[in-house]
Design a protein with these regions (language model features):
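Short, structured coil segments at secondary-structure junctions
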Residues: 25, 78-79, 99
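C-terminal binding/interaction regions
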Residues: 4-6, 10-11, 89-150
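Helix-adjacent hinge/juxtasegments
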Residues: 48-85
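Structural motif
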Residues: 38-47
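A short beta-strand-loop structural module common to alpha/beta enzyme folds
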Residues: 28-39
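Glycine-rich phosphate/diphosphate-binding loop of Rossmann-like nucleotide-binding domains
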Residues: 1-24, 28
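Alpha-helical segments flanking ligand/cofactor-binding loops in enzyme cores
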Residues: 20, 47, 51, 73, ...
Length: 150
């Protein structure tokens, strides 16, 4: 699985640590920024991840900011992106199994690094269930995207 990771300045410290952890578990990981702790704008990182996923440069994305919310809001503005904020392991697997989330959003100021690790590996190991009820709901989301994201 190819993983794309990015953060703004508020998520930079976790990104550096977690990037190495993900690689050590055998995942192919691409870091697309930010590369310093200088203040930057989270919508830019969300756009970078969204475009990478849309253009098949990665299978899943991980975005880290202060709360996880800002990057989630921005990433979800892209057709085909299903970004979810997860601050527990249940949400991390359920969001993939039921909603086929392709971008995990975390808040460095919200959770500890150990929990962040657990959430990331839970997210990466989870698989979409393909249950008819979940696929039906995803089809409805696609219809909403097609109607509203022109």
């Amino acid at each position: 699985m190819k993983v794309i990771i990015a953060s703004d300045h508020a998520g930079f410290e976790y990104k550096i640590v977690l990037l190495n952890d993900i690689r050590q578990q055998g995942y192919e990981v691409t870091d697309i920024g930010t590369f310093t702790k200088e203040p930057d704008d989270y919508p830019d990182r969300a756009a970078d991840i969204a475009n990478a996923i849309i253009n098949n440069k990665g299978d899943r994305g991980i975005l880290i900011c202060g709360s996880g919310v800002g990057v989630s809001v921005a990433a979800n503005k892209f057709k085909g992106i299903r970004a979810g904020v997860c601050h527990d392991t249940y949400s991390a697997h359920q969001c993939v199994e039921h909603d086929n989330v392709n971008v995990l959003c975390l808040g460095e100021r919200v959770i500890g690094i150990e929990l962040a690790r657990e959430i990331i590996f839970t997210f990466l190991k989870a698989e979409f269930s393909n249950a008819p009820r979940h696929q039906k709901r995803l089809n409805k989301i696609s219809d909403i995207e097609n109607e509203n994201m022109k």
